[in-house]
């Protein structure tokens, strides 16, 4: 089948990706989420899809404590509910039918999350495929978000999700508050704390007002 392969300009597939893909079962699946690792060979948590999206505040807390309950085992094939635009392989026909679910308003963060969630809501199945690997040179390591403007998009786009998909809601109000609080909680680990706080404030303000687009 004709396919589209998604990855950022700071990521790249391993050699022989098409050969590995040709060995996968494409009779039951049209969307595939690859295994994404950083340049040190460690799994990129930010690119790991959800088996089940932690939507409520209780699920969000449980996800913080036991993230493995919501994420696939790194080396195990399983169905997932979301995708990352680093390492997604998709049938071109399915992509063309769902182009309207890729929103420029969610620039940088949550655009892929939203897209995958909408695919599943439409009845599509997504296969987490660790046989296919991508390398991603990530700039967010542990609790340090660098450059600081990235937290703006993390906060703003989290709020914009509710406007783009009011029903069914991806995250509850309390779940969103908890997720936003997390970015304040990791303030001590940031290099430029006042700049970081400024972008959190702007992200929340613009998210509540429905302001989108590039802002850094």
Language model region names:
Residues 16-47:
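Conserved donor NDP-sugar-binding/catalytic core segment of glycosyltransferases
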Residues 1-10:
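Short beta-strand-to-loop acidic/aromatic patch adjacent to the donor-nucleotide binding site
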Residues 10-12, 106:
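Acidic metal-phosphate-binding loop of nucleotide-sugar-dependent transferases
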Residues 121, 125, 135-156, 191-195:
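Nucleotide-sugar-dependent glycosyltransferase catalytic core
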Residues 1, 28-29, 124:
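Short, high-confidence coil segments that cap the C-terminus of an alpha-helix
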Residues 82-83, 87-101, 105-132:
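A short, conserved alpha-helix in the catalytic core of glycosyltransferases
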Residues 52-81:
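Short, flexible, basic/aromatic active-site loop/helix in glycosyltransferases
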Residues 149-157, 167-216:
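Non-catalytic, C-terminal membrane-associated alpha-helical segments of glycosyltransferases
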